[in-house]
Amino acid sequence: MALLSSSLSSHIPTGAHHLTLNAYANTQCIPHFFSTLNAGTSAGKRSSLYLRWGKGSNKIIACVGEDSVSAPTLLKREFPPGFWKDHVIDSLTSSHKVAASDEKRIETLISEIKNMFRSMGYGETNPSAYDTAWVARIPAVDGSEQPEFPETLEWILQNQLKDGSWGEGFYFLAYDRILATLACIITLTLWRTGEIQVQKGIEFFKTQAVKIEDEADSHRPSGFEIVFPAMLKEAKVLGLDLPYELPFIKKIIEKREAKLERLPTNILYALPTTLLYSLEGLQEIVDWQKIIKLQSKDGSFLTSPASTAAVFMRTGNKKCLEFLNFVLKKFGNHVPCHYPLDLFERLWAVDTVERLGIDRHFKEEIKDALDYVYSHWDERGIGWARENLVPDIDDTAMGLRILRLHGYNVSSDVLKTFRDENGEFFCFLGQTQRGVTDMLNVNRCSHVAFPGETIMEEAKTCTERYLRNALEDVGAFDKWALKKNIRGEVEYALKYPWHRSMPRLEARSYIEHYGPNDVWLGKTMYMMPYISNEKYLELAKLDFNHVQSLHQKELRDLRRWWTSSGFTELKFTRERVTEIYFSPASFMFEPEFATCRAVYTKTSNFTVILDDLYDAHGTLDDLKLFSDSVKKWDLSLVDRMPEDMKICFMGFYNTFNEIAEEGRKRQGRDVLGYIRNVWEIQLEAYTKEAEWSAARYVPSFDEYIENASVSIALGTVVLISALFTGEILTDDVLSKIGRGSRFLQLMGLTGRLVNDTKTYEAERGQGEVASAVQCYMKDHPEISEEEALKHVYTVMENALDELNREFVNNREVPDSCRRLVFETARIMQLFYMDGDGLTLSHETEIKEHVKNCLFHPVA
């Protein structure tokens, strides 16, 4: 810094002087020299420091010279050139085409998926050999020496796999196979049938029992340590030749004994717990008359056919038999591991189409599904089925998040059911079980918090800690599901939480992570074809590429608009057409919003041009002239403008006349006056900042925020773009998203604060005097910069929670307008996630986001 000071001061006061600096290096020291510089300048003049990019764009040339006191700032700067040149874009888009046959296939897939939603009943799932074996044990109720359900016994005989096991043939999970195989050979032995199948099953068991310890504990099905040892004991009584003395078997038996020792007998009957799911493994300790009191309304015990079959064989309870008949009527000759799964199926299907970015095709189906879930919502939480007496945090968190975002009235207090005295969250009440998938869903849920919801903040903290630890522990993946890339899902969720996760980017990511053959783990492995399905993935890929091709055409048109408007001649501003277009394309991506995207992009580009003009280029007199020209909409004033300002104004005038004409057609009334008024307010905010800068005035934090929430210009972009969202907007509706609305204020506030947190240091080094951090430090001179920055983040986080509430509850505003406001706030969180993603997009992740959203098709 001393060397730089010497280099500059030694040349004062004669003329303009230059010093080459590394880009952005040491610029924070620049303000320290102004007192020295000004000492040698002429009366009525001020020394100013100008920055411009040297050749190669890796150097900044600092130029010291005299300027009139009416200059708005002490710093005039040029910006790094735009990365997205036409030849770069052409190289990425030249081979990308969507075939007509793809569009036809999209229509077919949409129809087929709609039929899937419409046919949802109690839940589609696959056979469970384990549960079918238990149902097949039931003797005929008429007293004959036959099975009550002979079709289930026949299913076992016909569905043994080639290796001698029972279970799903396409996916091998040793724990699952050995459990199902043991259940089947016991049932066949009890009925004295299938000797060949029994022998093959025993051979499989012996082979796999030796290897099973190589499989991760996280792949052990729910209740395995309860039911497996109990069946081994039964097999031993039946004289089956199994390796009972293997270390693995002894270890599982010890786990069962330890678990039962910790279980108070009275808790089994006091309230419903997950033990109801495994009663077939607890037959020696269950009081069958007491347990009946915990039977579900549908006659089942926690929807488990195996558990329900065991209770029926012990009690003869008619409701148990009715439930089993009900299940077999649905599935024919077999049963699943649990049934119904109606809430689980609907919630996860909705989540799937939303994350894959294809939900717009299924609005009615989604509403029907969520209406169904909401009709069974319980303040204690929900489980996987409507008659489920034991709520779980997985389904509850998924339901809370999705229902809330769709406008249903649900309270976050429901999560308190799953929090223990230490503040930890678990899947089931009173248990210590939790897995990556359920904690991931709680984490996703926690980000749609409303103000004052401490339970959501606690859930966020707890789950983030758990998930980060899980990423470091390979064995943590996963207790409840075998997913294609759960690790990738977790990494995305932690890096791009709700307020940074734009729809197109989430869709792009989830297309890569989604597994059409994913399976879940209950007591046995099971599949959900209406959740994991190749059709979802195929549609998502085709639809993404189709939309992307439309976006590429729009971008080319917008880049031509920039050039034809003469903006390439403006050296004082940033050319960021591609990055700016990426914003609406990432959230208002649907084909019907093409005009909205174009207006959003053009308006945003003008906010950048005029921000740079008012911030660091024009004199106060020039800026007043420009503002007056906009206010009067008067071309006669143009001749008095400098050449570059003429280009700005003529482009501005022509563009917004065209936008106003299109708006008149869309809205059925003249909107030019409305658009001009929006801009007048915007330019007033720019002018105030220019005056502050010229006077070296640092306002109070509140004064700064009041103006800066407008000067960030998000409101201007949204208020004009809203005219093109496909809705006729009355004055009343416009007022609900207007300058005076809390919704718009929060969008501007959060956008300004996140911008300041990532740019205040660089801008301070360039001579800027006002930012949220600096203004708060002025109000509180006793605090450190770090403390001020922390305060700004706190204000922003609280405002984001309030923004959530406005977005969800502001139902008098059309959905497309609500989205426009809310998503504009979110895109700011993404752009300024790790730096100035607009000015320095080529140095941040925005560059890759642009590629993935606009240029790289999914394969």
UniProtKB/Swiss-Prot annotation:
Mg(2+) 3 binds at residues 755, 763. GO terms for cellular component: chloroplast. Its EC number is 4.2.3.18, 4.2.3.32. Mg(2+) 4 binds at residues 392, 394. It is found in: Plastid, Chloroplast. A motif (DDXXD motif) lies at residues 611-615. Induction: Accumulates in apical leaders upon wounding in both resistant and susceptible to white pine weevil (Pissodes strobi) plants. It catalyses: (+)-copalyl diphosphate = abieta-8(14),12-diene + diphosphate; (+)-copalyl diphosphate = abieta-7,13-diene + diphosphate. Mg(2+) 2 binds at residues 611, 615. Keywords: Chloroplast, Lyase, Magnesium, Metal-binding, Plastid, Transit peptide. Disulfide bonds: none annotated. This is Bifunctional levopimaradiene synthase, chloroplastic. The gene is TPS-LAS.
